[in-house]
């Protein structure tokens, strides 16, 4: 599975804590992240992470492009809902794409834990079928 990991600045420590706690599960998958988040994950865990640009410099859009090509299976995005983000339209577009392409999305630690536990059980094997039908999702 291809998993995107994104965290706003005030949530990066939470992301590191999450990835560290679930490293045995995450290391079995292909990880992607926006720039700084990916760097922090690599430094803290040693996991291999494909890094895009930082979110405000287009990283969210790069992940969104993978979603639109049906090449991303899950997004874990620890958002900071209390701080205005200069790239909020990109964030909204990313969330919209997850809905359009039925990509599981967690925007907080509680939901992320549910997704990861489901991933561990094999609950997302259906994504392999969906990924094989590029362009056919939701009648597109």
Swiss-Prot record:
One of its GO terms (molecular function) is methylglyoxal synthase activity. GO terms for cellular component: cytosol. Substrate binds at residues 8, 12, 34-37, 54-55, 87. InterPro entries: Methylgl_synth, Methylglyoxal_synth_AS, MGS-like_dom, MGS-like_dom_sf. Residues 1-140 form the MGS-like domain. Its EC number is 4.2.3.3. One of its GO terms (biological process) is methylglyoxal biosynthetic process. The keyword Protein biosynthesis does not apply. Pfam families: MGS. PANTHER family: METHYLGLYOXAL SYNTHASE (PTHR30492:SF0). Belongs to the methylglyoxal synthase family. This is Methylglyoxal synthase. It comes from Geobacillus sp. (strain WCH70). The lineage of its organism: Bacteria, Bacillati, Bacillota, Bacilli, Bacillales.
């Amino acid at each position: 599975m291809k998993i995107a990991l994104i965290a706003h600045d005030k949530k990066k420590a939470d992301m590191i804590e999450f990835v560290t706690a679930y490293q045995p599960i995450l290391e079995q998958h292909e990880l992607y992240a926006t720039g700084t988040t990916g760097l922090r994950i690599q430094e803290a865990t040693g996991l291999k992470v494909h890094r895009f640009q930082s979110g405000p410099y287009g990283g969210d859009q790069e992940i969104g492009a993978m979603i639109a090509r049906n090449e991303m299976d899950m997004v874990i995005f620890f958002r900071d809902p209390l701080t205005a983000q200069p790239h909020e339209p990109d964030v909204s577009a990313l969330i919209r794409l997850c809905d359009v392409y039925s990509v599981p999305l967690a925007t907080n630690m509680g939901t992320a834990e549910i997704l990861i536990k489901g991933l561990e059980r094999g609950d997302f094997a259906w994504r392999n079928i969906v990924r094989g039908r590029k362009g056919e999702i939701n009648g597109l």
